[in-house]
Amino acid sequence: LHKAYTMDQLEEAVKEADVLVLALPFTKETEGLISRHILSLMKEDSLLVDVARAQLIDREALLDKVKNNPRFHVAMDVWWEENEAYPKDGDLLLAYPNVIGSAHNAEMSSTAHREALMNALHNIRAFMDGKPVKGKVNREEYRR
């Protein structure tokens, strides 16, 4: 990592990035963030990794990028529809050799589960004691 970018600098960041990792929440502001325009700015031989939500990416634009740019690579653990993780007839991403995916299970580890449990227990205790909880979600930011 040579430089950190803000969201306002997304275009500049993707032009320079060899790897773009999406680890953002799916909100009204992030839906479709990786648009056809943003994909067009990415290096032809770059890698896009999505471990957040598929809805952050314009699906049709990504499919076009993958089809037309064999040096562009994608790694995904999230899908617009869960059954899309398994290729069938048609233009599914996993049908292309420059795409690798897993079935929405990359976070499945004993460490991740233990950490989630410990965080939940901490927050329950804090809530019961009238203290602030960590990671409180603003429901207005998220789709319902």
Mark where each language-model region is.
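Structural motif corresponding to alpha-helix initiation and N-cap regions
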Residues: 4-10, 36, 59, 86-87
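Rossmann-like dinucleotide-binding domain for NAD(H)/NADP(H)
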Residues: 45-47, 51-144
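Rossmann-fold NAD(P) dinucleotide-binding segment
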Residues: 29-48
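Structural alpha-helical scaffold elements that stabilize or flank donor/cofactor-binding regions
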Residues: 12-16, 38, 92-93
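Adenosine-nucleotide cofactor-binding segment
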Residues: 1-33
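Solvent-exposed, non-membrane alpha-helical residues enriched in polar/charged side chains
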Residues: 11, 39-40, 63, 125
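Conserved beta-strand positions that form and line the central face of beta-propeller blades
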Residues: 3, 41, 136
